Amino acid sequence: TKLSIRSLAKESNVSQTAPYRHFKTKKDLYAAVATDGFKKLSKAMYVDSGKKVTKKQLVEMAIKYIEFGIKNANTYDLMFGTAVGNFSPYPELLESANSSYDNFRSSFSRLANDSDEIIAFKCITLWSVVHGLVGILRKVQVIGDEPLMNPEDGPMSSAILIASNLNDHLDKVVSGIVNN
């Protein structure tokens, strides 16, 4: 789906003209949608910060992240793309983006028994893998059941395999990152 005011309105369940009445600029609209997206992502991935986190919970967080990115493609693209640019003029956006990552990192740190520096490295590595999987799995959805030219060639055969068994794949990824 192409990013547009119309597609954002549809994804947000509002009329196509509503965005024009409520925001001064397109960038202000994009920032508001991205802010809301980060809040929804945080809520979907939330783990109580006072409790021990299991590997299974971290895998579930990763799956929630991926599901959000696939289901809310336009919002996700605003959250992580360049349409808004610098978040600094939008303090609520900056706070919601940081909060989303902070919950992920906090949860990871309660599972891994490492120094803060190692946790930062491992967490951004895991987040990068999960973030990358969103893009790859979105591509798998676009291809759907269409036959690949050479199914054994290229990354799509691997992507399709991962998509068919995402939970097990993420379990291995999380285990590998946490244990190394």
Model-flagged regions — what are they?
Residues T1-D28, A32:
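Helix-turn-helix
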Residues E11, D28-D48, E60, K64-E67, ...:
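Alpha-helical structural segments
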Residues R21, Y46-K55, G85:
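Helix-loop segments that flank and shape redox-cofactor active sites
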Residues K40-K51, V129-I136:
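Solvent-exposed, amphipathic alpha-helical segments
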Residues Y46, M79-S88, P147:
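Short linear capping/connector segments at secondary-structure termini
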Residues V53-E60, K64, S99, F121, ...:
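Amphipathic alpha-helical recognition patches that constitute DNA-binding helices
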Residues V59-F80, W127-V130, V134, R138:
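Helical hydrophobic small-molecule/effector-binding pocket
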Residues P91-L94, S109-K172, N180:
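Hydrophobic/aromatic-rich alpha-helical bundle segments in the mid-to-C-terminal region
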